[in-house]
Regions:
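N-terminal glycine-rich anion-binding loop in soluble enzyme alpha/beta folds
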Residues: 1-78
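Glycine-rich beta-strand-to-loop/alpha-helix junction loops that act as flexible
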Residues: 102-104
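Helix-loop module immediately N-terminal to the HCX5R catalytic loop
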Residues: 78-89
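Residue-level preference for the first positions of well-ordered beta-strands
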Residues: 16, 97-98
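Glycine-rich phosphate-binding loop signature in dinucleotide/nucleotide-binding domains
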Residues: 91-96
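Conserved small/polar residues in nucleotide/adenosyl-binding loops
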Residues: 112-114
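Short, well-ordered alpha-helical microsegments
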Residues: 108-109
Length: 114
């Protein structure tokens, strides 16, 4: 896991949760979105990241950001969609904001279905 330039804290309490969904099995054209979460994490290891958001929040001080890793994308695609929904629901139950990386367009259905 990367620390996104120091912004990520591995705490049990968090109000923003990052998850990766390395899934591209339903892509109707090119594959590759499954590598998105890994690539974003690899590019986000340096301190050159600006912790300030457009809304004036400092991600290093005012929020607790946690990277929950990747959702298991093995097995049938319906099982994958179910695991995505379960993961998002757990994040929302904590009153946190989910930030989702990767996944082909079919993953969107799981996200808006909730």
């Amino acid at each position: 896991m990367t620390d996104f330039g120091g912004a990520v804290k591995q705490s049990e309490e968090y109000n923003i949760a990052i998850i990766g969904i390395p899934f591209d099995e339903k892509s109707c054209y090119l594959r590759g979105t499954s590598k998105g979460p890994q690539a974003i994490r690899a590019a986000s290891t340096g301190k050159a990241i600006n912790p300030w958001t457009e809304f004036g929040a400092n991600l290093e001080e005012e929020v607790t950001l946690r990277d929950l890793g990747d959702v298991d994308v093995s097995g049938d695609f319906l099982d994958v969609f179910s695991r995505v929904e379960e993961t998002i629901l757990k994040i929302l139950e904590k009153k946190a904001v989910p930030v989702v990386m990767g996944g082909d367009h079919s993953i969107s259905l799981s996200l808006i279905h909730i």
